[in-house]
Amino acid sequence: VKYFKAIAAMSLNRVIGAGNRIPWHLPEDFQWFKRTTLGSVVVMGRKTFESLGKPLPNRKNLILTRHPQQLIRQHPDIFGQYREWRGGKAPKEHQYQPRFIRLDGNRNEDIRIFSSLKLLDPEEFADQIFICGGAQVYEQLLPRCSDLYLTLVKREVEGDAFFPEFESRFVLEEEIRDTPEFSIRHYRNKSL
């Protein structure tokens, strides 16, 4: 059985976002995220996707949203070719689930939109699948994650998006990196 993995960064008071932005700037942590997820599948909610402004390069991007057509309409710069592929017609949700859409032949940016977690099957992908936000997506998918890679930012910050409780479900496997500003920890799900 194949499981998801989660990757996140949170402050001491569990904040992961403020105004749809990351409330700290830690280039070393961004590099860790990039190295870890490169070549993998990344799953994110609509708000997380919109905060990035574009698909993450060299990864397959899966976006969870209850309103896929709205997302497509709001981002014609990203999904323009996607609409063209469907002949400009408004497809039924299940019609565009089965395959990835290559957005640019020169870059390996693949993107898929999911309207339901039920449609997200980790067995469908050969690559590792990382859950990377936001708060609602973590809340729903952490129980299905075998591993959690968590950056703990060693300060409290103001925010409006919080990482869910995970401590009762996960056990610390190893501390990957420890700096004065943050630490990166690998947790394993006790029940998977």
For each of these PLM feature ranges, what is it?
Residues V1-L192:
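Enzymes that bind and transform nitrogen-containing heteroaromatic metabolites
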